């Protein structure tokens, strides 16, 4: 799309919401059309630009999408699973596209998203960063070459406030590796180890989780053999990388037909 894409951001007052507002401000092809907070928030009525320190944008934080129906083309949501489902339902009814960066969806919620995406364009990805999406491609190659004879472990770390574990990015890493190797992640995943576990089963994929301080996001996949190991690591030092990826997804999504897309498609990696 040649012109500016208007975006709305829900959860505007949160850590990620504020970063998204700042990212939208700096994007040439994006314009912030609306910013939404929960009813009762002390931020309702505040100018979104002044909230994040970029100056007045004349976009006042509101407490309902219903007040912003004509102000945006794509909704960007990094909130919580239950809220994201409600917002997607709203987007379907009002013919709006949606970018979902929320993680922690259960199986039933994912099925709801699949059904809604038949009626409106949706990009959903556990991680919007370019580097992470490239990492998933590298994991495919590593799994093809080394996966059958190495022990595979995935280690991830995030800030103390993150609510779901393992992270959506770590689970996607496991899914990519398992699919490449013809395994079912639900059957081969091992989440943490404690006590007398016995010898390691080569077919398993292990997960370890760290929650500490202000870690933005660190992910490592280890392919370990006797005598050598390969580690593929991505470290995020700022949430801005995720926000910029979400803006890129929004700009791409506005011209797509209804369907469920991911960042691999946005970036042309598929």
From Swiss-Prot:
InterPro entries registered for this protein in UniProt: DapB_C, DapB_N, DapB_N_CS, DHDPR_bac, NAD(P)-bd_dom_sf
GO molecular function: 4-hydroxy-tetrahydrodipicolinate reductase; NAD binding; NADP binding; oxidoreductase activity, acting on CH or CH2 groups, NAD or NADP as acceptor
Superkingdom classification of source: Bacteria
Binding positions (NADP(+)): 38
Subcellular localization: Cytoplasm
Matches recorded under Gene3D superfamilies: Dihydrodipicolinate Reductase, domain 2, NAD(P)-binding Rossmann-like Domain
EC number(s) per entry: 1.17.1.8
The keyword Lipid biosynthesis is annotated on this UniProt entry: no
Residue positions of the active site: 158, 162
GO biological process terms, semicolon-separated: diaminopimelate biosynthetic process; lysine biosynthetic process via diaminopimelate
Residues the entry annotates as binding (S)-2,3,4,5-tetrahydrodipicolinate: 159, 168-169
Pfam families xrefs: DapB_C, DapB_N
Catalysis performed (reactions): (S)-2,3,4,5-tetrahydrodipicolinate + NAD(+) + H2O = (2S,4S)-4-hydroxy-2,3,4,5-tetrahydrodipicolinate + NADH + H(+); (S)-2,3,4,5-tetrahydrodipicolinate + NADP(+) + H2O = (2S,4S)-4-hydroxy-2,3,4,5-tetrahydrodipicolinate + NADPH + H(+)
Listed CDD domains: DHDPR_N
GO terms for cellular component: cytosol
Alphabetical keyword list: Amino-acid biosynthesis, Cytoplasm, Diaminopimelate biosynthesis, Lysine biosynthesis, NAD, NADP, Oxidoreductase
Statement: the UniProt record of this protein carries the keyword DNA damage: no
Top-level EC class as recorded in UniProt: oxidoreductase
Involved pathway(s): Amino-acid biosynthesis; L-lysine biosynthesis via DAP pathway; (S)-tetrahydrodipicolinate from L-aspartate: step 4/4
Binding site for NAD(+): 11-16, 37, 101-103, 125-128
NCBIfam families: dapB (TIGR00036)
Assigned protein family: Belongs to the DapB family.
Function text: Catalyzes the conversion of 4-hydroxy-tetrahydrodipicolinate (HTPA) to tetrahydrodipicolinate.
Protein name: 4-hydroxy-tetrahydrodipicolinate reductase
């Amino acid at each position: 799309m040649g012109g500016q894409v208007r975006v709305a951001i829900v959860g505007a007052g949160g850590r990620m919401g504020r970063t998204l507002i700042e990212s939208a401000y700096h994007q040439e092809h994006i314009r912030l059309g609306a910013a939404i907070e929960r009813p009762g928030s002390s931020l309702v009525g505040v100018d979104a630009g002044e909230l994040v320190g970029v100056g007045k944008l004349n976009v006042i934080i509101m407490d309902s999408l219903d007040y912003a129906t004509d102000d945006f083309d794509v909704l960007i949501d990094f909130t919580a699973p239950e809220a994201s489902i409600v917002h997607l339902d709203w987007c379907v009814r009002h013919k709006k596209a949606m970018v979902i960066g929320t993680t922690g969806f259960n199986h039933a919620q994912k099925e709801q998203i699949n059904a809604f995406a038949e009626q409106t364009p949706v990009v959903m990805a556990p991680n919007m960063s370019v580097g992470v999406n490239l990492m998933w491609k590298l994991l495919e190659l590593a799994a093809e070459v080394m996966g059958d004879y190495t022990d595979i472990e995935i280690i991830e770390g995030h800030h103390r406030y993150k609510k779901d574990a393992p992270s959506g990015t770590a689970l996607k890493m496991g899914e990519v590796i398992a699919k490449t190797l013809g395994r079912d992640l639900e059957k081969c995943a091992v989440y943490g180890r404690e006590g007398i576990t016995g010898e390691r089963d080569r077919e398993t994929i292990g997960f370890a989780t760290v929650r500490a301080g202000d870690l933005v996001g660190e992910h490592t996949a280890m392919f370990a053999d006797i005598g050598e190991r390969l580690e593929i690591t991505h470290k995020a030092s700022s949430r801005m990388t995720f926000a910029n990826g979400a803006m890129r997804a929004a700009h791409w999504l506005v011209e797509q037909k209804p369907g469920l897309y991911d960042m691999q498609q946005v970036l042309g990696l598929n």
